[in-house]
From Swiss-Prot:
An MF annotation (GO) of this entry: carboxylesterase activity
Keyword annotations: Disulfide bond, Glycoprotein, Hydrolase, Secreted, Serine esterase, Signal
Cellular-component GO terms for this entry: extracellular region
Similarity-based family: Belongs to the type-B carboxylesterase/lipase family.
Residues spanning the signal sequence: 1-28
The keyword Disulfide bond is assigned to this record: yes
Entry superkingdom: Eukaryota
Residues annotated as the enzyme's active site: 226 (acyl-ester intermediate), 345 (charge relay system), 454 (charge relay system)
Record protein name field: Carboxylesterase 5A
Gene encoding the protein: Ces5a
Processing after translation: N-glycosylated.
Catalysed reactions, as listed in the record: a carboxylic ester + H2O = an alcohol + a carboxylate + H(+)
Function field: Involved in the detoxification of xenobiotics and in the activation of ester and amide prodrugs.
Length: 575
């Protein structure tokens, strides 16, 4: 993943392009930039409210295509080129089930460009103010997209508005998804975590090349939502990420979120499923890997529907131990961080996919059945959850709202707050937020009870109201929402510049210290203190202690929840 990739035969061509670029100046409709692999030609775009255009470079390779023998392998250095490379077309999507990408497009009221799909997908896009050039040394913000590690793309996000309004470079990256990104034989033949290795390769490319686009390689902030935020939280815990980034923003996702780890039994079962398809002995990893590398992309996609337990693993390299253990041992990269959640993470997008029936309303019996099924809390102990969450709740809508809040607490809010405490106690400055605004564009398309749902903050961070290109992120934004978007872009960019989101003309954002103050992001921004403190205590203290005292047999999934959330209590008691 390292080394000098310059080819001597390129020298004369580069001299010509350098001379041409000097004559042409930094502001041009066809910006040219040097990289260690060869020259690239981008294009320019504009955003609403700004005269200055933004330079856009699409589809720059940061690794060799992971095809053939490189499938289920660590990413290799990209292949250099001799001629000027056009970087004006969107790269292919990484292989994924397109059905949900299209469904999300409708549910989120966004529009994406037409994109191809291929395993040859390890590319990144760059958005830079047109004045940015070698020596500008602007802050760099690298977006790692989400999508449950199953869907997503660099090209469904447009960094133009954030770049030109805040004078930063925005880079959006791609990484392998699903079985392509996480298949493992649980040994040295295919240790797994390919998606995380892809992210490391992209960050290495940024470190070695971003200065030629006007970015500062010593001021790189990684930010992302959902699976992207989980990736960032994971990169913070990996020893391999040293010097690749300097600040981190985690939007609705951290590495200790329950359900990220599959049980050993599930992995063994799915390996056997794969072996049966390949007509191989499951113990013959080399033969199994050879068979899988000969399968078509579509065959692997079909196989992934039968074998869904391939997720992140402790491989002894990217992860030396489980994320919770690394956090508790303070084995993490100490960087300034922003961690945040939305005030109804499981309000609509997530349940409409997995449990749409509860959106119409629920009774207590149905709610408890879902809790038992999804969280594996023993039936005899569901009364504890009933007392905490459903006391005094009788109407179907009240029970539904409470149930959705419970799932949001378990999967996003409590893990986020627990992670923030670990980061704080490890010595890194932490800022926490709760996004609370329901976007106006959903006025007629979402149920009225839905507040700020999962991913709703993204359109504000990217300046969605000001975009006018192929990616439409926020039509029908109100004037108040445009102002909120400006403020959020400013907070995020200030943090990318200095590690502190505060700045002139912005409501103060307190650091997340022992007082646990946080920012409430809405059209009227305010601060709060000890977000959902009672719920955090319930999931990290009350319920685990009762279950432990009763010696209840816990499922692997729920054991992970309890371990993830109880450890801060146990550690503080031991200290």
């Amino acid at each position: 993943m390292s080394g000098d990739w310059v080819r001597p035969g390129q020298a004369l061509i580069w001299v010509i392009w350098i001379f041409g670029a000097i004559i042409e100046g930094s502001v041009t409709e066809e910006p040219h930039r040097y990289t260690k692999l060869g020259w690239v030609q981008g294009k320019q775009a504009t955003v609403l409210g700004r005269l200055e255009p933004v330079n856009v470079f699409l589809g720059i390779p940061f690794a060799a295509p992971p095809l053939g023998p490189l499938r289920f392998s660590k990413p290799q250095p990209p292949i250099p080129w001799d001629n000027l490379r056009e970087a004006t077309a969107y790269p292919n999507l990484c292989f994924q089930n397109l059905e949900w990408l299209f469904i999300y497009q409708n549910l989120l009221k966004v529009s994406y460009p037409i994109l191809g799909m291929s395993e040859d997908c390890l590319y990144l896009n760059i958005y830079a103010p047109c004045h940015a050039n070698n020596g500008s040394s602007l802050p760099v913000m690298v977006w790692i997209p989400g999508g449950g590690f199953e869907t997503g793309s660099a090209s469904i996000f447009d960094g133009s508005a954030l770049a030109v309004y805040e004078d930063v470079l925005v880079v959006t990256i791609q990484y392998r998804l699903g079985i392509f990104g996480f298949f493992t034989t649980q040994n040295q033949h295919a240790p797994g975590n390919w998606a995380f290795w892809d992210q490391l390769a992209a960050l290495l490319w940024v470190r070695e090349n971003i200065k030629y686009f006007g970015g500062n390689p010593d001021s790189v902030t990684i930010f992302g939502n959902s699976a992207g935020a989980i990736s960032i939280s994971s990169l913070i815990l990996s020893p391999l990420s040293a010097d690749l980034f300097h600040r981190a923003i985690m939007q609705s996702g951290v590495a200790i979120i329950p359900s990220l780890k599959s049980s050993d039994n599930d992995l063994k079962h799915d390996l056997q499923v794969v072996a049966n398809v390949c007509d191989c002995n499951v113990s013959d990893s080399k033969a199994l890997l050879k068979c899988l590398r000969e399968k078509s992309s579509l065959e692997l996609m079909s196989l992934s529907q039968k074998a869904k337990s391939f997720t992140r693993v402790v491989d002894g390299s990217f992860f030396s131990e489980e994320p919770l253990e690394l956090l508790s041992q303070k084995t993490l990269k100490i960087v300034p961080s922003i961690i945040g959640v939305n005030n109804q993470e499981c309000g609509y997008i997530l349940p409409v996919r997995d449990t749409p029936e509860i959106l119409l309303g629920s009774n207590e019996s149905t709610a408890l059945t879902l809790i038992h099924t999804l969280l594996h809390i023993p039936t005899q102990h569901l009364y504890i959850v009933t007392k905490e969450y459903f006391h005094g709740k009788h109407s179907p809508t009240d029970i539904r709202d409470t149930l959705l809040d419970l799932f949001g607490d378990v999967f996003f809010v409590v893990p986020g707050l627990v992670t923030a405490r670990y980061h704080r106690d490890s010595g890194g400055p932490v800022y926490f937020y709760e996004f609370q605004h329901r976007p106006h564009c959903f006025q007629n398309s979402r149920p009225a009870f839905v507040k700020a749902d999962h991913t709703d903050e993204i359109r504000f961070v990217f300046g969605g109201p000001f975009l006018k290109g192929d990616v439409v992120m926020f039509e029908e934004a109100t004037e108040e929402e445009k102002l909120l978007s400006r403020k959020m872009m400013k907070y995020w960019a200030n943090f990318a510049r200095s590690g502190d989101p505060n700045g002139a003309d912005l409501p103060p954002w307190p650091v997340y210290d022992e007082n646990e103050q946080y920012l409430e992001l809405d059209v009227n921004i305010s601060t709060g203190r000890r977000l959902k403190d009672q719920r955090v205590e319930f999931w990290t203290d009350t319920l685990p202690l009762i279950l432990s005292a009763s010696k209840a047999l816990l499922s692997p999934t729920f054991s992970l929840i309890l371990l993830s959330l109880l450890s801060p209590v146990l550690l503080s008691a031991a200290s």
